[in-house]
Protein backbone atom coordinates (compact mmCIF):
# COMPACT_ATOMS: atom_id res chain seq x y z
CA UNK A 1 0.00 0.00 0.00
CA UNK A 2 1.08 3.58 -0.58
CA UNK A 3 3.03 5.17 2.26
CA UNK A 4 3.79 8.70 1.13
CA UNK A 5 1.19 11.39 0.53
CA UNK A 6 2.02 11.60 -3.18
CA UNK A 7 1.84 7.81 -3.60
CA UNK A 8 -1.60 7.78 -1.96
CA UNK A 9 -2.75 10.52 -4.32
CA UNK A 10 -1.43 8.63 -7.34
CA UNK A 11 -3.22 5.46 -6.18
CA UNK A 12 -6.48 7.40 -5.81
CA UNK A 13 -6.09 8.99 -9.24
CA UNK A 14 -5.21 5.66 -10.84
CA UNK A 15 -8.35 4.07 -9.39
CA UNK A 16 -10.48 6.97 -10.65
CA UNK A 17 -8.97 6.65 -14.15
CA UNK A 18 -9.46 2.86 -14.09
CA UNK A 19 -13.16 3.26 -13.38
CA UNK A 20 -13.50 5.99 -16.02
CA UNK A 21 -11.70 3.89 -18.63
CA UNK A 22 -13.80 0.83 -17.77
CA UNK A 23 -16.95 2.85 -18.37
CA UNK A 24 -15.68 4.16 -21.70
CA UNK A 25 -14.51 0.70 -22.80
CA UNK A 26 -17.91 -0.76 -21.93
CA UNK A 27 -19.69 1.96 -23.92
CA UNK A 28 -17.41 1.33 -26.91
CA UNK A 29 -18.05 -2.42 -26.79
CA UNK A 30 -21.81 -1.85 -26.55
CA UNK A 31 -21.89 0.24 -29.73
CA UNK A 32 -19.66 -2.29 -31.50
CA UNK A 33 -22.08 -5.07 -30.50
CA UNK A 34 -25.02 -3.03 -31.81
CA UNK A 35 -23.23 -2.66 -35.15
CA UNK A 36 -22.43 -6.38 -35.30
CA UNK A 37 -26.02 -7.30 -34.42
CA UNK A 38 -27.38 -5.08 -37.20
CA UNK A 39 -24.93 -6.59 -39.71
CA UNK A 40 -25.83 -10.16 -38.70
CA UNK A 41 -29.53 -9.33 -38.96
CA UNK A 42 -28.93 -8.15 -42.52
CA UNK A 43 -30.42 -4.72 -41.84
CA UNK A 44 -28.29 -2.39 -43.96
CA UNK A 45 -29.98 0.84 -42.78
CA UNK A 46 -29.64 -0.01 -39.09
CA UNK A 47 -26.07 -1.19 -39.60
CA UNK A 48 -25.16 2.05 -41.38
CA UNK A 49 -26.74 4.09 -38.58
CA UNK A 50 -24.92 2.06 -35.92
CA UNK A 51 -21.63 2.46 -37.77
CA UNK A 52 -22.18 6.23 -37.97
CA UNK A 53 -22.30 6.27 -34.17
CA UNK A 54 -19.49 3.75 -33.62
CA UNK A 55 -16.96 5.31 -36.01
CA UNK A 56 -16.36 8.62 -34.19
CA UNK A 57 -16.52 6.75 -30.89
CA UNK A 58 -13.73 4.40 -31.97
CA UNK A 59 -11.69 7.37 -33.20
CA UNK A 60 -12.18 9.17 -29.90
CA UNK A 61 -11.13 6.12 -27.86
CA UNK A 62 -8.02 5.75 -30.02
CA UNK A 63 -7.16 9.43 -29.55
CA UNK A 64 -7.59 9.15 -25.79
CA UNK A 65 -5.32 6.10 -25.72
CA UNK A 66 -7.98 3.65 -24.61
CA UNK A 67 -7.36 1.47 -27.68
CA UNK A 68 -4.63 1.48 -30.30
CA UNK A 69 -5.30 3.51 -33.44
CA UNK A 70 -4.76 0.42 -35.61
CA UNK A 71 -7.44 -1.46 -33.68
CA UNK A 72 -9.89 1.38 -34.32
CA UNK A 73 -8.97 1.42 -38.01
CA UNK A 74 -9.32 -2.38 -38.26
CA UNK A 75 -12.80 -2.39 -36.73
CA UNK A 76 -13.98 0.49 -38.89
CA UNK A 77 -12.67 -1.19 -42.05
CA UNK A 78 -14.23 -4.57 -41.22
CA UNK A 79 -17.58 -3.05 -40.30
CA UNK A 80 -17.63 -0.97 -43.48
CA UNK A 81 -16.72 -3.98 -45.65
CA UNK A 82 -19.40 -6.11 -43.98
CA UNK A 83 -22.06 -3.44 -44.54
CA UNK A 84 -21.09 -3.03 -48.19
CA UNK A 85 -21.42 -6.81 -48.64
CA UNK A 86 -25.05 -6.73 -47.44
Curated annotation (Swiss-Prot):
GO terms for cellular component: cytosol; small ribosomal subunit. One of its GO terms (biological process) is translation. Residues 1-28 are annotated as: Disordered. Keywords: Ribonucleoprotein, Ribosomal protein, RNA-binding, rRNA-binding. GO terms for molecular function: small ribosomal subunit rRNA binding; structural constituent of ribosome. Gene3D superfamilies: Ribosomal protein S20 (1.20.58.110). Residues 1-27 have a biased composition (Basic residues). It comes from the Bacteria. Belongs to the bacterial ribosomal protein bS20 family. HAMAP family: Ribosomal_bS20. Binds directly to 16S ribosomal RNA. This is Small ribosomal subunit protein bS20. The lineage of its organism: Bacteria, Pseudomonadati, Pseudomonadota, Gammaproteobacteria, Vibrionales.
Amino acid sequence: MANSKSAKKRATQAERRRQHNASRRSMMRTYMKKTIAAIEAGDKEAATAALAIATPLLDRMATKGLIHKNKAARHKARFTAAIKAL
